[in-house]
C-alpha cells in the first residue's frame, strides 16, 4: 500500500515536445529529496493533452530513469473504461509500481457505474491501484460507501482524496480501516489528513520543494508534530497560491522561474497571468527558498 510523499510530477515541454533533459533532472531532484514516488501522466502532468504515444513513452522513460530508487505510480485514468484498461495494461507491461485511476469525467456515472469501472480496471492491473477522487475536476464524487466496496478488491489498495472535505475523508478512513491507505490530493490538507489517519500526499508543491514535504510528513509520523506544523504554516500561502489558477498553470510557471523547465504549457491551458497575485506567488516561493527549504 502506498504511503508517504508522491510527487504529481509536471511534464516539461520544449517546442511542443516532451523535454526529457529537463524531466530527468526533475526526477533526480525527487530521488535526492527522498520522496516515496512520482506520479507521471496525472493532472499536474497535463495528461489530457498527451497523445497515447507520448503517454506510454513518458511512463516508460520514468521507470527507466528512476531505476527502482523510488516508486512510479502511473496515471492511467479515462472516462472510457476500455481506454483506462488499455492504458493500465500498457503501464503494467512497463513495470510501474502502481497505477492512479481517476473518476471517469464528463459522462457522470452513478456510484454503481463507478464501482464497476474501477473493478474492471483493477481486474486488468498486475500492480496495486490508487483511486483518485477529485469531483472538482470530474463532476462526480466517489462516495465513502462505494470506496468501502472497492476496498474488498485485491488490487485496490490506496486512494488519493481531493474532495477538500475532511469530514468525508474521516468517514472514508473509518470505513476502510487498514484495507486501504488514504493520501491527500491537496497540499494544504496534508497535515490535517495525517491527523485523522491519512498516510501521506500526492503533492503538487513537492515539484519545487520535495525535501520540505518529505520532512513534514516524516516529522508527523515520528511524533514531532510541532516541527511538522511549522513547515505547514510556513507553506500555507504557497499552498493556496499554487492553485490561484487551474493546476498545473501556477506550478509550471514556478518551475520555470527557478530554472527547472521552460514555461511552455499546452492549450487549452495557458501560461500564468502576470498580475499582483502571480507576483505574490513568486515572492512567497522566494521567501521559502531564503528560509532554506528545498
Swiss-Prot record:
Keyword Amino-acid biosynthesis in record: yes
SMART domains the UniProt entry points to: DHDPS
SUPFAM superfamilies, alphabetized: Aldolase
GO molecular function: 4-hydroxy-tetrahydrodipicolinate synthase activity
Catalytic activity: L-aspartate 4-semialdehyde + pyruvate = (2S,4S)-4-hydroxy-2,3,4,5-tetrahydrodipicolinate + H2O + H(+)
Major location (coarse): cytoplasm
Pathway annotation: Amino-acid biosynthesis; L-lysine biosynthesis via DAP pathway; (S)-tetrahydrodipicolinate from L-aspartate: step 3/4
Gene Ontology CC terms, in alphabetical order: cytosol
InterPro entries attached to this UniProt entry: Aldolase_TIM, DapA, DapA-like, Schiff_base-form_aldolases_AS, Schiff_base-form_aldolases_CS
GO biological process: diaminopimelate biosynthetic process; lysine biosynthetic process via diaminopimelate
Site (Part of a proton relay during catalysis): 43, 106
A Pfam family this chain is assigned to: DHDPS
Entry keywords, A to Z: Amino-acid biosynthesis, Cytoplasm, Diaminopimelate biosynthesis, Lyase, Lysine biosynthesis, Schiff base
Presence of the UniProt keyword Lyase in the record: yes
Residue positions of the active site: 132, 160
Binding site for pyruvate: 44, 202
Entry's EC annotation: 4.3.3.7
Assembly behavior: Homotetramer; dimer of dimers.
Family designation: Belongs to the DapA family.
Protein name: 4-hydroxy-tetrahydrodipicolinate synthase
Organism: Leptospira borgpetersenii serovar Hardjo-bovis (strain L550)
Lineage: Bacteria, Pseudomonadati, Spirochaetota, Spirochaetia, Leptospirales
Amino acid at each position: 500500500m502506498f504511503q508517504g510523499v508522491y510527487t504529481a510530477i509536471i511534464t516539461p515541454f520544449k517546442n511542443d515536445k516532451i523535454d526529457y533533459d529537463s524531466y530527468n533532472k526533475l526526477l533526480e531532484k525527487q530521488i535526492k529529496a527522498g520522496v516515496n514516488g512520482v506520479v507521471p501522466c496525472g493532472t499536474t502532468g497535463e495528461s489530457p493533452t498527451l497523445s497515447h504515444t507520448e503517454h506510454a513513452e513518458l511512463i516508460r522513460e520514468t521507470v527507466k530513469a528512476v531505476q527502482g530508487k523510488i516508486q512510479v505510480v502511473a496515471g492511467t485514468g479515462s472516462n472510457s473504461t476500455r481506454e483506462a484498461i488499455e492504458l493500465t495494461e500498457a503501464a503494467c507491461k512497463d513495470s510501474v509500481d502502481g497505477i492512479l485511476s481517476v473518476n471517469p469525467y464528463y459522462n457522470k456515472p452513478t456510484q454503481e457505474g463507478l464501482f464497476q469501472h474501477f473493478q474492471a480496471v483493477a481486474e486488468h492491473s498486475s500492480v496495486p491501484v490508487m483511486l483518485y477522487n477529485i469531483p472538482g475536476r470530474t463532476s462526480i464524487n466517489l462516495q465513502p460507501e462505494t470506496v468501502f466496496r472497492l476496498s474488498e478488491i485485491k488490487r485496490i489498495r490506496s486512494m488519493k482524496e481531493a474532495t477538500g472535505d475532511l469530514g468525508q475523508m474521516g468517514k472514508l478512513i473509518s470505513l476502510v480501516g487498514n484495507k486501504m491507505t488514504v493520501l491527500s490530493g491537496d497540499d494544504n490538507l496534508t497535515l490535517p489528513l495525517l491527523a485523522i489517519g491519512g498516510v501521506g500526499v500526492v503533492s503538487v508543491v513537492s515539484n519545487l520543494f520535495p525535501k520540505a514535504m518529505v520532512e513534514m510528513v516524516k516529522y508527523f509520523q515520528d511524533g514531532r508534530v510541532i516541527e511538522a506544523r511549522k513547515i505547514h504554516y510556513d507553506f500555507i500561502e504557497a499552498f493556496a497560491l499554487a492553485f490561484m489558477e487551474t493546476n498545473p498553470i501556477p506550478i509550471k510557471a514556478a518551475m520555470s522561474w527557478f530554472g527547472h523547465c521552460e514555461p511552455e504549457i499546452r492549450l487549452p491551458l495557458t501560461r500564468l497571468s502576470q498580475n499582483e497575485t502571480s507576483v505574490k506567488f513568486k515572492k512567497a516561493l522566494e521567501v521559502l527558498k531564503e528560509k532554506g527549504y528545498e
